[in-house]
């Protein structure tokens, strides 16, 4: 087997380090021994955008907030379904992730960061959510490993009751909060309901095909 080769590292605000590595044509981002992202598994990240933005294809000036740039799969899927007049804000906590997108991972991103619809906001995605006040038609969260925070302690605030109520307030009427997770989480689904959302839990394939592990996407809608 071809060994993993280290490309770069990124220190996290709460301590710990992300490692960008590759094995042949496959790129991975690791936190400790946990694989957070892989270039070979993009199906569920793409589903986060296609499901979360499903009703926005014909909405003029739709505004979408994406939490987490990752390897760009959610962003590119959102770009594919959103109209030319849309605005897409990507909040990314770790500056090196953006640097990697323009460097060793540029082949995955292609020219998606040059799209005039896209802007990058460095910092915690919770900040634009709290300041949102009915601004967003969709909020797509692929932050950490899902509601069970792994790499950033503050993500507990994002996925807790107060954070979900803030997300509800940041959505326009009829807007959708879409949340990715590696695992099911009954308690989180219940918190979504208590925050006022109508909740639809979907199982999606990590590969995007008919085989492979399932991930979870919650579609939490604000009443229109």
Locations of the language-model features?
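Active-site beta-loop-alpha junctions enriched in small/polar residues
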Residues: 182-184
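The AdoMet/dcAdoMet-binding core of the Class I SAM-like
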Residues: 2, 42-171, 179-180, 190, ...
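Generic beta-structure capping elements
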Residues: 23, 32, 141-146, 223
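Short, surface-exposed beta-strand-loop junctions and turns on beta-sheet-rich folds
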Residues: 35-37
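C-terminal lobe and adjacent flexible extensions of AdoMet/dcAdoMet transferase-like proteins
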Residues: 218-224
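N-terminal auxiliary segments of SAM/dcSAM-dependent transferases
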Residues: 1-30
């Amino acid at each position: 087997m071809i060994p993993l080769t280290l490309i770069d590292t990124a220190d996290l605000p709460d301590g710990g380090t992300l490692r960008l590595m590759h094995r042949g044509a496959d790129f991975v981002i690791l936190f400790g021994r946990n694989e957070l992202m892989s270039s070979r598994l993009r199906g569920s990240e793409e589903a986060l955008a296609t499901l979360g933005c499903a009703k926005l294809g014909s909405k003029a000036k739709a505004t979408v907030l994406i939490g987490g740039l990752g390897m760009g799969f959610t962003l590119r899927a959102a770009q594919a379904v959103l109209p030319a007049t849309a605005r897409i804000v990507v909040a990314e906590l770790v500056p090196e992730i953006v640097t990697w997108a323009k460097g060793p991972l540029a082949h995955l991103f292609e020219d998606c960061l040059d799209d005039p619809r896209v802007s990058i906001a460095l910092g915690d995605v919770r900040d634009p959510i709290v300041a949102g006040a009915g601004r967003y038609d969709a909020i797509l969260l692929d932050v950490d490993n899902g509601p069970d925070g792994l790499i950033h302690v503050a993500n507990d605030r994002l996925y807790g009751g107060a954070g979900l109520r803030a997300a509800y307030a940041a959505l326009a009427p009829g807007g959708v909060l879409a949340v990715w997770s590696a695992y099911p989480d009954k308690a989180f689904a219940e918190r979504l309901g208590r925050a006022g959302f109508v909740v639809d839990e979907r199982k999606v394939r990590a590969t995007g095909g008919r085989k492979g592990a399932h991930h979870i996407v919650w579609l939490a809608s604000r009443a229109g």
